[in-house]
């Protein structure tokens, strides 16, 4: 009897073991492999992951469509959506890769301007601290310009123009930061060269009034009263309501150069004639 009880117990466990194996195999067989799904089904899964907030999984599934069904009608859209999903996840390098492949494969597509815009944004969104290298800013500017020049009537041309202005402001801020450092440490010519870049290359940015004021400071420190006077005249003409105007006026209050500004030579004379007199030749 004891033997029979042991035998029954062992038989029960063996039976249970095989049942578990059978259930596991059945479960595995019911799981559909990705390769068994159509492009449309994979796209639906990817879109659901995207909508649910799992952009990483969504990007993987979108790229699976490109891998499994490269010639399907959804491959093109999936490739672009992978760039969008990766951008959301701040995986900018991978996002650029997907967008660049889209441009290579579909250069004349209606969504190609958007692919360029994603590339530009991937650079632009990495612009942060003014103390860092500005290579990213220049890459963003280059791609935004491509959009404006090649696709001026696209919906991305106007936001690209706005982003260019903001990028210019960022570059001007970088020049101002370096220029102030040189000015503070009495490296006047080095400071002048930095402020000159702001006035000549980024004249529409918010930093131009201060750049002109700092030029007045630097030129007066070097005893170059003519240059200081012209810098002040440009500031007074264009930015009289600026917070820098009164400080500049006070600096130049006791300066009497007897200068005929209209005949002044050099880069400041050119700027003066262009800005105030409207002579662009």
Protein language model features and the residues they cover:
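Acidic, polar-rich low-complexity tracts and alpha-helical solenoid repeat scaffolds
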Residues: 2-7, 21-281
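Bacterial N-terminal signal peptides
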Residues: 13-22
């Amino acid at each position: 009897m004891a033997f029979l009880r042991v035998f029954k117990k062992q038989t029960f466990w063996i039976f249970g073991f095989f049942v578990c194996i059978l259930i596991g195999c059945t479960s595995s067989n019911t799981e559909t492999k990705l390769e068994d799904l159509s492009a449309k089904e994979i796209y639906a899964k990817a879109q659901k992951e995207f909508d649910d907030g799992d952009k990483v999984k969504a990007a993987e599934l979108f790229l699976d469509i490109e891998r499994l069904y490269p010639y399907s009608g959804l491959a093109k859209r999936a490739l672009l959506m992978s760039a969008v999903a990766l951008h959301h996840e701040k995986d900018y390098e991978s996002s650029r890769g997907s967008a660049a492949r889209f441009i290579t494969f579909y250069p004349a597509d209606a969504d190609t301007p958007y692919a360029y815009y994603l590339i530009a944004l991937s650079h632009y969104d990495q612009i942060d601290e003014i103390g860092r290298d500005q290579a990213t800013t220049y890459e963003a500017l280059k791609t935004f310009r491509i959009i404006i020049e090649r696709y001026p009537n696209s919906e991305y041309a106007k936001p690209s123009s706005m982003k260019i202005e903001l990028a210019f402001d960022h570059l001007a801020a970088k020049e101002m930061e370096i220029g102030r450092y040189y000015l503070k440490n009495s490296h006047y010519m080095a400071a002048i060269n930095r402020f000159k870049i702001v006035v000549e290359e980024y004249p529409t940015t918010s930093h131009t009034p201060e750049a002109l004021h700092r030029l007045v400071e630097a030129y007066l420190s070097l005893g170059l009263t003519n240059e200081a006077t012209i810098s002040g005249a440009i500031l007074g003409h264009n930015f009289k309501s600026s917070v820098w105007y009164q400080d500049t006026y006070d600096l130049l209050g006791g300066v009497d150069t007897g200068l005929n500004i209209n005949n002044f030579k050099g880069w400041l004379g050119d700027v003066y004639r262009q800005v105030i007199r409207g002579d662009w030749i």
